[in-house]
Amino acid sequence: MPNIKIFSGSSHQDLSQKIADRLGLELGKVVTKKFSNQETCVEIGESVRGEDVYIVQSGCGEINDNLMELLIMINACKIASASRVTAVIPCFPYARQDKKDKSRAPISAKLVANMLSVAGADHIITMDLHASQIQGFFDIPVDNLYAEPAVLKWIRENISEWRNCTIVSPDAGGAKRVTSIADRLNVDFALIHKERKKANEVDRMVLVGDVKDRVAILVDDMADTCGTICHAADKLLSAGATRVYAILTHGIFSGPAISRINNACFEAVVVTNTIPQEDKMKHCSKIQVIDISMILAEAIRRTHNGESVSYLFSHVPL
């Protein structure tokens, strides 16, 4: 493809390489380093004048450093006369801070949107935003892609009894997500209502729906410390589920998450590779990964060629 350049930030170079390989491109030359005072320095190592530039950087790992690196890369390309700069952010940072839920709370997702725009981003490509209204925080186009087609494909190919399963949301907020998957599989859905007293601590769970003698598949957009999904798995087993799976778009897995998964009753915890999982998989055999590089690569190809990306909302590209 002419007049296109793809650069990778340091957060997830493996995913960036897979995207570039699928597009038949080489990653652009970029050098990132830190000065002795920990300031981030980025050097774009090739001309981007008149080019359609895509910068891949996920909101994971050292999130603040990686966000700053992305902003600097966007700005460096913009002032070097790139014709368009698109930030490809598989896991959007600060997405959970999307509303003012208590006095004096910041809306940090809006701040990040402002920063990306001011840095010079012309377009954002992301996946499974924690709150879809974050798209409205931008005055530039945002393509919020979905892992759902890849999740459906994984369920059909890897769970032999998928016709006898129930899709379960671990909270009321995910009801729309699980009903969509359940409808497309033509199976039932359930949800778990949770009463939470402190952040990351679940007090009481109430199952709404039937999982008795069925395979229960927990579906959520992200899991951090995994307290919620591990409690939910216990609840589902006690309600008569034969087996329990968890399928998540963004596997953050911080703090005690890995030990909780190892001690939980999951057959498998399936995540996409919006966040690197290699190190975590070494410590937890239950973690399996769905590759979504083909979805992001096809979104980039269609964007570059001026084509619609809505096909990707219901299909997995080959």
UniProtKB/Swiss-Prot annotation:
Regulation of its activity: Activated by magnesium and inorganic phosphate. Inhibited by ADP and GDP.
Effect of S132F: No effect on catalytic activity
GO cellular component terms, A-Z: cytoplasm; cytosol; ribose phosphate diphosphokinase complex
Top enzyme class: transferase
Known catalytic reactions: D-ribose 5-phosphate + ATP = 5-phospho-alpha-D-ribose 1-diphosphate + AMP + H(+)
Residues where Mg(2+) binds: D128, H130, D139, D143
Effect of H193Q: In PRPS1 superactivity; no effect on Km; resistant to inhibition by ADP and GDP
Matches recorded under InterPro entries: PRib_PP_synth_CS, Pribosyltran_N, PRibTrfase_dom, PRTase-like, Rib-P_diPkinase, Rib-P_diPkinase_bac
Gene Ontology MF terms: ATP binding; identical protein binding; kinase activity; magnesium ion binding; protein homodimerization activity; ribose phosphate diphosphokinase activity
Pfam families: Pribosyl_synth (PF14572), Pribosyltran_N (PF13793)
Pathway note: Metabolic intermediate biosynthesis; 5-phospho-alpha-D-ribose 1-diphosphate biosynthesis; 5-phospho-alpha-D-ribose 1-diphosphate from D-ribose 5-phosphate (route I): step 1/1
Sequence segments annotated as region (Binding of phosphoribosylpyrophosphate): 212-227
Bilayer-spanning residue ranges: none
Subunit structure: Homodimer. The active form is probably a hexamer composed of 3 homodimers.
Role, per record: Catalyzes the synthesis of phosphoribosylpyrophosphate (PRPP) that is essential for nucleotide synthesis.
Family to which the UniProt record says this protein belongs: Belongs to the ribose-phosphate pyrophosphokinase family.
HAMAP family: RibP_PPkinase_B
Disease: Phosphoribosyl pyrophosphate synthetase I deficiency is a rare condition caused by mutations in PRPS1 that lead to variable disease phenotypes including optic atrophy, retinitis pigmentosa, ataxia, peripheral neuropathy and hearing loss. Phosphoribosylpyrophosphate synthetase superactivity: Familial disorder characterized by excessive purine production, gout and uric acid urolithiasis.
PANTHER family attached to this UniProt entry: RIBOSE-PHOSPHATE DIPHOSPHOKINASE FAMILY MEMBER, RIBOSE-PHOSPHATE PYROPHOSPHOKINASE 1
Name of the molecule in the record: Ribose-phosphate pyrophosphokinase 1
